[in-house]
Amino acid sequence: MISREELLSKLSQVLPQPLYKEVEEAVRDLDDEKALRLVYRVLKLYVTSLIDPGEAIGIVTAQSIGEPGTQMILRSFHYAGLREFSMARGLPRLIEVVDARRTPSTPLMYVYLKPPYNKSREAAESVAKKIQQVTLETLAKEVDVDYVAGTVTITLDQEQLKYRGLTLKDVEKIVAKAKGKDVAISMRGYTITASLTTPDILKIRKIKDKILQIKISGIKGVRKVVLQYDSKNDEWYIVTEGTNLEAVLQLEEVDPTRTYSNDLHEVEEVLGIEATRALVAQEIKRVLEEQGLDVDIRHMYLVADAMTWSGRLRPIGRHGVVGSKESPLARAAFEVTVKTLIEASVRGEDELFKGVVESIIAGKYVPIGTGIVRLLMQF
């Protein structure tokens, strides 16, 4: 009888690493007989779950995501009064992901903390204050504009300064660095005054807006922070409105192995294409689960693979995955048909009929299922 160690060694060469680690963990406390039965059972299930050659996984994935997507639209209209079923959280976000939009409509970061900062609300709040961008507008109690004299006067809120852990010297140091053409900025006590050398109504309004946006502390781009408690893992984490993943990951209190942004392009630039692939699948799954829809994660990963296999994030569409197909007929079948065919003709492209779409258009055997079989004559 084969030993447990030999079987696990052979199993590690067959199973994917994450699945193998789960099996290894599960058999650790079992006797040899039960361990072998479990391993054989897992191996049988794994082998029978593999896709057969020629399986039309693309259309299965499209149906598996598209049909629940239709339900999501219907539910969104039906439950229009409920925030959790609103269109803004469902279909629009799904479109943002598959279109790989450059800027999401609601950029967010999920900032996870290292112990002990994640074990108490006070410790997590101290990190949140460190992350949130604080501008003069945040600290302002009162803003007065004198259009005749050409001055902007800002009165600071003492309670806000105390809450943010800032002093007048901190603010004064930042304000002293602020410079502008034909503008003089001074600070006396809790009052900041900006004066134009030559009064100008239009210019003074622009000066007011710029001064209020001067960053005093925090990370640029992070407009709001909200503390969240995860009861399952007994920890506090931070959700931010606005993202700056690279800057946040440099904080020693932040756990870089779990912190992420919902901005696909930012994740690609900071963490790489593999992290982007995982995020695409995770975001699609999260959007569907929020609507109470259960879809196998492997369908999401197939979409993610199609968007990232080239090493760069590409949208699903004529400017990305579909537009990069070798077949001119497949490209033409998606959008802008006439233009695509004319351009393909000018370049003298060949149609090899290797894909599904172009084969259907031409009435040829589709290269899926039994269509991939080619019989050879034996002489």
UniProtKB/Swiss-Prot annotation:
* Gene Ontology CC entries for this record: cytoplasm; DNA-directed RNA polymerase complex
Keywords from the named record: Cytoplasm, DNA-binding, DNA-directed RNA polymerase, Nucleotidyltransferase, Transcription, Transferase
**CDD domains noted in UniProt:** RNAP_A
Read off the Pfam families from this record.
Answer: RNA_pol_Rpb1_5
What would you give as a GO molecular function for this chain, any one? DNA binding
EC number(s) given by UniProt: 2.7.7.6
Q: Which family does it belong to?
A: Belongs to the RNA polymerase beta' chain family.
What is the protein's given name? DNA-directed RNA polymerase subunit Rpo1C
- Encoded by which gene? rpo1C
